[in-house]
């Protein structure tokens, strides 16, 4: 039986792919035979390390630096990607910022700050999705084929006190994707979201190890008593980027260990 999750004949571009979830998505694409993988990150060295890893394993990848919140930067990235591979068949809007390197005021209550602090979150989590999707769509429309997957978060679906601007940006990205799905279906372009919960990144794991009681409280919120792994998310993104999901569009798929469910 053929591999229904094969990426052969497809070129994927993954934003924020220099580490964690984005890195694993890029590796998944390559492992499933993608003709090419464009590894984007704001930090070129991180993107290059992932591209080198893919190429060393026999894949075909390039690293491209771009700030997804900057429209011109994104346009230049896509131009270079198309120059290299001729097309982008699958776009994964993975780049996000929940405050890893925020504006100095970004951790204060949002009503005590202002637009400069808010831009930290809106620029990447909302504007970045629009910029990259706008850059990808013309080619997809011309070829009558394309997959767009945007990573959002439980905060964007259910809210999270103290993360109002981030959550609003993620919710906005989801609404944008729903409209893209409705408008682009006639062109055989699929648009979906993957909703993720807390991920077991090295930084989070370190924090939980230092505070076992807090770790216990966090894990009790998840039906499956662990944090997410990058491969959990990458598996779903691979499905939504492959031919296996050709009749699936306009959906949000929670990959969050049962933090929320709608059965």
What are these regions, as identified by a protein language model?
Residues 102-119, 218:
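Substrate-binding pocket helix/loop in short-chain dehydrogenase/reductase
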Residues 2-4, 158, 238, 249-263:
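Short C-terminal tail/terminal secondary-structure segment
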Residues 34-49:
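Conserved glycine-rich Rossmann-like NAD(P)H-binding loop of the short-chain dehydrogenase/reductase
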Residues 4-38:
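Canonical Rossmann dinucleotide-binding motif of NAD(H)/NADP(H)-dependent dehydrogenases/reductases
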Residues 138, 182-183, 246:
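Alpha-helical segment proximal to the catalytic Tyr-Lys
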Residues 89, 97, 111-130, 145, ...:
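Catalytic Tyr-X3-Lys loop
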Residues 133, 169, 177:
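Active-site helix of classical SDR
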Residues 92, 185, 190, 248-250:
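Short, small/polar-rich loop/turn modules that mediate ligand/substrate recognition or access, typified
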């Amino acid at each position: 039986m053929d591999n229904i999750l094969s990426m052969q004949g497809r070129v994927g571009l993954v934003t924020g792919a220099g580490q964690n979830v984005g890195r694993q998505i890029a590796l998944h694409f390559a492992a499933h035979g993608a003709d090419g993988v464009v590894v984007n990150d704001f930090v070129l060295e991180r993107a290059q390390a992932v591209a080198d890893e893919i190429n060393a394993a026999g894949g075909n990848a390039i690293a491209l630096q771009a700030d997804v919140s900057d429209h011109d930067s994104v346009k230049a990235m896509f131009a270079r990607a198309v120059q290299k591979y001729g097309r982008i068949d699958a776009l994964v809007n993975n780049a996000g910022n929940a405050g890893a390197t925020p504006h100095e005021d970004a951790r204060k209550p949002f009503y005590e700050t202002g637009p400069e602090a808010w831009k930290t979150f809106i620029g990447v989590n909302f504007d970045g999705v629009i910029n990259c999707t706008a850059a990808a769509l013309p080619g997809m429309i011309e070829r009558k084929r394309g997959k767009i997957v945007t990573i959002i978060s439980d905060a964007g679906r259910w809210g999270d006190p103290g993360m109002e601007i981030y959550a609003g940006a993620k919710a906005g990205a989801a609404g944008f994707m729903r409209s893209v799905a409705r408008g682009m279906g006639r062109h055989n372009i699929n648009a979906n979201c993957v909703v993720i919960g807390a991920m077991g990144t090295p930084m989070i794991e370190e924090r939980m190890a230092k505070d076992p009681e807090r770790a216990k409280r966090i894990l009790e919120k998840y039906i499956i008593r662990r944090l997410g792994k990058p491969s959990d998310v990458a598996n779903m993104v691979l499905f939504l980027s492959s031919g296996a999901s050709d009749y699936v569009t306009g959906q949000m798929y929670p990959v969050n260990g049962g933090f929320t469910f709608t059965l």
